[in-house]
């Protein structure tokens, strides 16, 4: 029997390995409480990933721990051990989570990645999405709930049917037969983006055609106002006030939006586009969606074009071209002046978000250049744009 621990933010994970029975329960208790005392103020979670067996003596140790930790949780519990907890009533007293099946991405085809994870083809019928954060379970559960909501609302989306362990983190499994991402379509034919753009915009329009109830998803206007309030002290006073006033003047809309709409997040199956990443669902005026799209294709990689290559696998020039084609398709016009006018409105949202992000990461080597660029562009755009609506 071994007892080890690790700390992640405010959580103290105590791992118990092997068998805990009458012969070593006292020793296990001594080690567990010593770790707890040495790390005060932490929420205790028992990690049973390698716990093979627990007897009544071991259960009494958990009862004593629970008296001091009313919110005690036990995770990664094997089937046989879970049966013991269930039969003895512990599942009614303590939050106990079963162990998830283990999968590996070794040898799997890489499809795409986003801010929070990466997507792989596990086999001909299965897509595996991995999450970068070790404590991604709440995020995964929220994304599954968002996917369910979107599906009920009529959006063609892939709903994960299983949670798995991938290394030290988690993943979700989705059945997607013969599917490829819009990113792959672009990489395969960067000289003709028409097919990829049609899938991309058809899906976007289907999302924006849906109205949701207040409180069903976050309101993006409120989020954007928070961005403006954060960056305003770093701008000339008149610019900071105008930025907030422009966002404040955007009328409330209950239009459903994706919130992170880029080509890695759309798959094509049997000639139909479908979404695979749903953790950023929100609502509001489409200018907020277009702002995030501008960042995804141009803003985030404006000062370093290799960012586009690393994220999508196609060039920054291709991303710029795709943004232009997609915007025209979304607006339903080839008029350059109309499209530029709307693009500038979206850019104000995009640069505001990027400026906040860079200001919050002052120690990153790229931040000073990003801050300077965002300020420069916001000054230019705020002198030209008098409304964000279109």
Language model regions located:
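An alpha-helical support segment within catalytic cores of ATP-dependent transferases
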Residues: 209-259, 263, 269
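ATP/Mg2+ or Mg2+-diphosphate-binding catalytic cores
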Residues: 337, 352-390
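Juxta-kinase regulatory segment immediately upstream of eukaryotic protein kinase catalytic domains
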Residues: 100-106
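ATP-binding pocket architecture of kinase catalytic cores
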Residues: 109-215, 251
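STAS-typified acidic loop motif
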Residues: 1-30, 48-50
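Amphipathic alpha-helical interaction surfaces in cytosolic regulatory modules
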Residues: 22-94
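Active-site activation/catalytic loop segments of kinase-like enzymes and analogous catalytic loops
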Residues: 290-334, 348-364
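Activation of the activation-loop gatekeeper triad in protein kinase-fold domains
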Residues: 277-281
């Amino acid at each position: 029997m071994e007892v080890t621990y690790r700390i992640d933010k405010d959580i103290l994970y105590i791992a118990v390995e092997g068998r805990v029975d009458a012969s070593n329960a006292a020793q296990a208790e001594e080690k567990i409480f010593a770790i707890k005392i040495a790390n005060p103020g932490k929420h205790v979670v028992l990690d049973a990933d390698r716990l093979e067996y627990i007897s009544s003596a071991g259960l009494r140790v958990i009862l004593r721990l629970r008296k001091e930790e009313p919110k005690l949780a036990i995770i990664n519990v094997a089937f046989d051990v879970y049966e013991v907890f269930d039969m003895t009533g512990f599942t009614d007293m303590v939050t106990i989570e079963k162990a998830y099946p283990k999968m590996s991405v070794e040898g799997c085809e890489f499809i795409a990645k986003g801010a929070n994870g990466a997507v792989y083809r596990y086999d001909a019928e299965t897509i595996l999405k991995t999450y970068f954060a070790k404590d991604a379970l709440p995020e995964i559960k929220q994304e599954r709930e968002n996917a369910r909501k979107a599906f009920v609302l009529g959006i063609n989306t892939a709903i994960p049917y299983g949670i798995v362990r991938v290394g030290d983190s988690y993943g979700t499994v989705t059945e997607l037969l013969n599917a490829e991402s819009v990113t792959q379509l672009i990489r395969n034919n960067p000289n003709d983006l028409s097919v990829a753009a049609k899938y991309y915009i058809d899906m976007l329009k289907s999302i924006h055609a849906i109205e949701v109830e207040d409180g069903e998803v976050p309101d993006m206007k409120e989020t954007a106002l928070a961005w403006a309030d954060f960056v305003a002290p770093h701008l000339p006073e008149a610019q900071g006030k105008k930025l907030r006033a422009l966002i404040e003047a955007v009328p409330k809309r209950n239009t459903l939006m994706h919130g992170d709409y880029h080509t890695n997040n759309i798959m094509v199956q049997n000639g139909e586009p479908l979404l695979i990443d749903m953790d950023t669902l929100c609502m509001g005026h489409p200018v907020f969606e277009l702002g995030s799209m501008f960042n995804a294709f141009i803003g985030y990689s404006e000062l370093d074009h290799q960012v586009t290559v690393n994220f999508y696998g196609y060039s920054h020039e291709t991303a710029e071209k795709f943004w232009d084609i997609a915007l025209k398709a979304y607006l339903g016009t080839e008029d350059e002046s109309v499209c530029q006018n709307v693009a500038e409105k979206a850019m104000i949202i995009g640069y505001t978000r990027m400026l906040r992000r860079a200001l919050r990461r002052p120690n990153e080597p790229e931040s000073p250049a990003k801050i300077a660029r965002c300020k420069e562009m916001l000054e230019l755009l705020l002198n030209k744009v008098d409304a964000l609506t279109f």
